[in-house]
């Protein structure tokens, strides 16, 4: 019986090897998730009370997922092969947040050190949200969530 199993395994050679590698990579992918900073956690709290899945659509259906991502935000930082519906997942939402911050919340762009207030207000109000008075209330909510 052992010989038969061996020969079956040998007969599948590369397929068996590929399956083992694929399984190992999938296990690793599941185990590794995006780490969440206190600011991201606070924004998540403000946006959806830390909803993890099947989050309600916000802004009259214009924003989706745990971080309430608008299509325009996603379009700014998406990569080939990604879909807007991926924003429904927390890990992907965090990646979009990080990419958006890397693009818009930079010292070079703001011409000064970037603060959590800048990041939160940019997230809420777009690339120039850090300047908009309309994002001040949002920052207060995020700040309160940071203190909880």
Model regions and ranges:
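Short, solvent-exposed loop/turn and secondary-structure capping segments
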Residues: 54-56, 134-135
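Short, low-complexity, charge-dense intrinsically disordered segments
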Residues: 3-17
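Short N-proximal segments of mature Sec-exported proteins
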Residues: 56-75
